[in-house]
Amino acid sequence: MHEASYALTIVDTVMEALKKEGLENVKVTKVIIKIGELSLVDPVALRNAFEAYSLGSPLEGAELEIEVVPSKFVCKRCGHEWTFKDVYPELKANIPVIHLYPHLVKDLLKCPKCNSSEVEIVQGTEFVIEGFEYQESNE
C-alpha cells in the first residue's frame, strides 16, 4: 500500500514548509495535491493514511484535496495520442504491477494505431503538492 508513503511525504513536506516559513502557530486547513492516474492511488486509502500521519500535528483535521491527473501517451512513430482508459482492457491483467511500478506501463503499451512499442508517457505519473491553506491557531 504505497498510499501510506504518499501520505507521509505530504505531511513531512508541509511540516518542512511551515518550519521554513516560520509558520509555527498555524493550523493547516487544506492540502492540495495532484496525483497521476497511473499511480493507481486509492483516494480513500490516501485520505485515511494522511489522517493517521497528521495526528498531533498542525495538519490534523486538514482537508486533503486530490486532483487526479489523467494519463496521456503519445506514439513516437506515428504521433497518435491516447489515454490509459483507452487501453485498460488490454492492461487489466497487469494492474497490480502498474500499481507498484507505474513507469513500467510504458513497456507494456503498444500504439493502438500503428502497433509500435515506441511510446512516451506525456502525463499521468505526477505527484505534486500544489499548496496548502492555513489559519492562525488559537493554541
From Swiss-Prot:
Tell me the GO molecular function terms.
Answer: nickel cation binding; zinc ion binding
Cross-referenced PROSITE patterns: HYPA
- Residues at which Zn(2+) binds: C75, C78, C111, C114
Keywords from UniProt, A to Z, are: Metal-binding, Nickel, Zinc
InterPro entries found in the cross-reference section: Hydgase_Ni_incorp_HypA/HybF_CS (IPR020538), HypA/HybF (IPR000688)
Binding positions for Ni(2+) per the UniProt entry? H2
Recorded hits in Pfam families, A to Z, give: HypA
UniProt keyword Metal-binding, yes or no: yes
GO biological process terms on file: protein maturation; protein modification process
- Purpose: Involved in the maturation of [NiFe] hydrogenases. Required for nickel insertion into the metal center of the hydrogenase.
Query: What is the similarity comment for this entry?
Result: Belongs to the HypA/HybF family.
PANTHER family, per this entry?
HYDROGENASE MATURATION FACTOR HYPA (PTHR34535:SF3)
Stated name of the protein: Hydrogenase maturation factor HypA
